Curated annotation (Swiss-Prot):
Membrane topology, as annotated: Lipid-anchor
Spans annotated as Hypervariable region: 166-185
Keyword list, A-Z: Acetylation, Cell membrane, Golgi apparatus, GTP-binding, Hydrolase, Lipoprotein, Membrane, Methylation, Nucleotide-binding, Palmitate, Prenylation, Proto-oncogene, S-nitrosylation
Name recorded for this polypeptide: GTPase HRas
Length: 189
């Protein structure tokens, strides 16, 4: 069974733990209890493949930022979460993405941008803004509500699909030998 190491990142209070607990336990946690670091495991079937999700729910608070490099090194894919009613959390996504790219030493890291709390009427980040940001990063964007469960599975499962595609790209890199080459090999004897 394939195991996927997923890391949930984002500013404090955006609902990272609520999303994770909703996926794992089908339960909405409405009281805010800042996370230092929690790990969850769940066996799921995605596109016909049984797999084990190893999800690391991380601290959003700045005082725990020193711990980020460590979990970013071990993660295979990242849910970058902001709250649609918190513009600052949306602006913070850029810092998380840059730190992930730096720690992974790669521009090609599986990520999904997640706009959480879409059940709330007081939106300050428009869907179009988030879609544009995700497009500029070349990653999917999904709106979620940990409260209603909307988009929760979709966000995590899309990240697994991104990791799968990333692994395939690494196994079969695009042919860089030029436009005229048809992958022919010449043998001179």
């Amino acid at each position: 069974m394939t195991e996927y190491k997923l890391v949930v990142v984002g500013a404090g209070g955006v609902g990272k733990s609520a999303l994770t607990i909703q996926l794992i336990q089908n339960h909405f946690v409405d009281e805010y209890d800042p996370t230092i670091e929690d790990s969850y495991r769940k066996q799921v079937v995605i596109d016909g493949e049984t797999c084990l999700l190893d999800i690391l729910d991380t601290a959003g608070q700045e005082e725990y930022s020193a711990m980020r490099d460590q979990y970013m090194r071990t993660g295979e894919g990242f849910l970058c979460v902001f709250a649609i009613n918190n513009t600052k959390s949306f602006e913070d996504i850029h810092q998380y993405r840059e730190q992930i790219k730096r720690v992974k030493d790669s521009d090609d890291v599986p990520m999904v941008l997640v706009g959480n709390k879409c059940d709330l009427p007081a939106r300050t980040v428009e869907t179009r803004q988030a879609q544009d940001l995700a497009r500029s990063y070349g990653i999917p964007y999904i709106e979620t509500s940990a409260k209603t469960r909307q988009g929760v599975e979709d966000a995590f499962y899309t990240l697994v699909r991104e990791i799968r595609q990333h692994k395939l790209r690494k196994l079969n890199p695009p042919d860089e030998s030029g436009p005229g080459c048809m992958n022919c090999k010449c043998v001179i004897s």
